[in-house]
């Protein structure tokens, strides 16, 4: 039995970090990714295509997206498509899933409890749906298979032992423990929700197949899962992302003027494709007018550049400044003598005050 599994595509995602034009381009990229996934399922001669939830954003989908999904899955007919709604594409009365007249190769899991579908003689797929955007209990709680053969689960949930591997702030929807999978009589679980890919002994998180945010790790892929008659699985990840998202840190030590900042950022981004987030860090001269807005056009070959300040320090000679018979000198002396400030607070007050006294606009201190 050969299955292709993906999850967390998030069609119609807002891409709040991008301007409207770039965000729309990213949403088009998500659609192209789904087409590649379907083509891969056909090319790999899979017995079924499985989506483990968050196919789209329920609170943002458009009628055009509904038509796109129907036609995309219809084009691979008669290849079966199994959909297990997650917390972002949860199954409710107003769901996109309810508004589409799907072709007969599409099977939508609708129950909040795992329900069986026979894939072939001796092979059963168990799937379930989130029926609300939050507070969905674990699908494996109290569950046990009730028949012989090989059993695979498809759902959207949070393996509690995986939390240390996943991105911070991820809400544990439909929580479960890996040990519950074999204890329930399942041979393997295909799971969505966590965006970091993970191939564990009893379960697979494919991760989001197309980049959604900065800081993502692991290859953006769909997973071909071969299941033999004993229930053993073999997995192969296939890259399906059409674009790349990069996190780049640019060191600013020794920078004396703004043009050098631009040059360093341009050099760091040369040869990259897609979208990049640049984090600026290091020690710069006091007179450098650092404005991240000036860097957005530094790499026109990229789809977008998002720039942020990391730990940027200003190389003030405080001993020289403290010796001045000026307002600035008195300020430096007062901050140095302030006993109620921690070293970090003193640094921030010093830099902010000196910038303000110089008439600078960039008062934010990291």
Each model region followed by its residue ranges:
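Acidic/glycine-enriched edge-of-secondary-structure segments
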Residues: 21-28, 124-127, 243-257
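A generic secondary-structure signal
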Residues: 36-44, 72, 142, 264-268
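Domain-start "cap" segments at the beginnings of catalytic or binding domains
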Residues: 1-22, 220, 226-248
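His/Asp/Glu-rich metal-coordinating catalytic cores
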Residues: 48, 57-204, 208-221, 226
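Short coil/turn segments at beta-strand junctions that form active-site/ligand-binding loops
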Residues: 1, 45-47, 79, 149, ...
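N-terminal active-site segment of His-dependent metallophosphoesterases
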Residues: 1-67, 147, 347, 351-366
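Accessory, non-catalytic peripheral segments of nucleic-acid enzymes
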Residues: 231-366
């Amino acid at each position: 039995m050969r299955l292709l599994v993906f999850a967390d595509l998030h069609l119609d995602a807002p891409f709040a970090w991008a301007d409207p034009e770039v965000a729309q381009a990213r949403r088009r990229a998500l659609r192209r990714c789904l087409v590649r996934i379907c083509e891969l399922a056909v090319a790999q001669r899979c017995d079924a295509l499985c989506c483990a939830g968050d196919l789209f954003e329920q609170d943002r989908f458009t009628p055009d997206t509904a038509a796109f999904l129907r036609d995309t899955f219809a084009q691979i007919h008669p290849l079966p498509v199994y959909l297990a709604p997650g917390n972002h594409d949860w199954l409710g009365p107003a769901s996109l899933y309810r508004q589409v007249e799907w072709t007969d190769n599409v099977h939508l899991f609708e129950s909040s409890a795992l329900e069986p579908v026979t894939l072939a003689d001796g092979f059963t797929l168990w799937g379930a749906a989130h029926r609300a955007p939050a507070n969905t209990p674990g699908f494996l709680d109290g569950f046990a298979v009730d028949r012989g053969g090989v059993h695979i689960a498809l759902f959207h949930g949070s393996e509690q032992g995986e939390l240390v591997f996943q991105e911070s702030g991820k809400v544990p929807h439909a929580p479960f423990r890996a040990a519950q999978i074999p204890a329930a009589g399942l041979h393997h679980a295909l799971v969505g929700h966590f965006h970091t890919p993970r191939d564990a002994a009893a379960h697979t998180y494919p991760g989001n197949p197309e980049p959604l945010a900065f800081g993502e790790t692991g290859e953006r892929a769909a997973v071909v899962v071969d299941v033999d008659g004993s229930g053993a699985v073999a997995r192969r990840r296939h890259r399906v992302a059409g674009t790349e998202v990069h996190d780049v840190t640019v060191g600013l030590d020794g920078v004396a003027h703004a043009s050098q900042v631009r040059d360093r950022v341009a050099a760091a981004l040369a040869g990259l494709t897609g979208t990049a987030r640049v984090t600026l860090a290091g020690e710069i001269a006091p007179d450098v007018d650092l404005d991240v807005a000036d860097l957005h056009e530094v790499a026109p070959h990229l789809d977008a550049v998002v720039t942020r300040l990391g730990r940027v320090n200003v190389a003030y000679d405080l001993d020289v400044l403290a010796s001045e018979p000026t307002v600035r000198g008195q300020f430096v002396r007062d901050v140095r003598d302030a006993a109620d400030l921690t070293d970090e607070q003193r640094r921030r007050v010093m830099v902010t005050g000196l910038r303000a006294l110089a008439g600078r606009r960039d008062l934010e201190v990291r």
